[in-house]
Swiss-Prot record:
The protein's name in its UniProt record: Peptidyl-tRNA hydrolase
Protein's UniProt keywords contain Metal-binding: no
GO molecular function: peptidyl-tRNA hydrolase activity
Keyword Plastid in record: no
Record EC number: 3.1.1.29
Family: Belongs to the PTH2 family.
Reaction(s) the record says it catalyses: an N-acyl-L-alpha-aminoacyl-tRNA + H2O = an N-acyl-L-amino acid + a tRNA + H(+)
Compartment annotation: Cytoplasm
Pfam families referenced in this protein's UniProt entry, alphabetically: PTH2 (PF01981)
Record function comment: The natural substrate for this enzyme may be peptidyl-tRNAs which drop off the ribosome during protein synthesis.
Any one GO CC term of the record: cytosol
EC top class named in words: hydrolase
Length: 112
C-alpha cells in the first residue's frame, strides 16, 4: 500500500510551503480511509511518494479518477496567509491504497 501526493509545480511554492501543503494533503486523505486500510498502510511504513503536475486542471482530473475508483483522496486549497492567493489549489493526495491502484492513476507523473 502507498499514497501519492501530487503538487502543482507551476505555482513554484517555496520548500516550506510545499512541505506544509503535502502534509495537509496526506493527513486529509488518510482521514478518508477506512480503519482497516489505514492500519495496513501505517503497519507497512506509511509509504508515500511526491509527484508533480503542472496545472489545477490535472489535479482535478486525478481527483475524478480516484473518485471513480473509490480511492481515498483529498484536494488541498491554500488559506492564502503567505505565498498564495486564498483558495489556490496546491496539491492532491491519493490513497493510501494498493500500489497497483495508485500507479494506475499516477504512473505517468514525474517525481517532484
Amino acid at each position: 500500500m502507498k499514497q501519492a501526493i501530487v503538487a502543482r509545480a507551476d505555482l513554484r511554492m517555496g520548500k516550506g510551503k510545499l512541505a506544509a501543503q503535502v502534509a495537509h494533503a496526506s493527513l486529509s486523505a488518510v482521514e478518508d480511509t477506512g480503519t482497516r486500510s489505514e492500519k495496513q498502510w501505517k503497519g507497512g511504513g506509511q509509504k508515500k511518494i511526491v509527484l508533480k503536475a503542472n496545472s489545477e486542471k490535472k489535479l482535478f482530473q486525478l481527483a475524478d479518477e480516484a473518485e471513480r475508483d473509490g480511492i481515498p483522496h483529498a484536494v488541498v486549497r491554500d488559506a492564502g496567509h503567505t505565498q498564495l492567493e486564498p483558495g489556490t489549489v496546491t496539491c492532491i493526495a491519493i490513497g493510501p491504497d494498493s500500489d497497483e491502484n495508485i500507479d494506475r492513476i499516477t504512473g505517468s507523473l514525474s517525481l517532484y
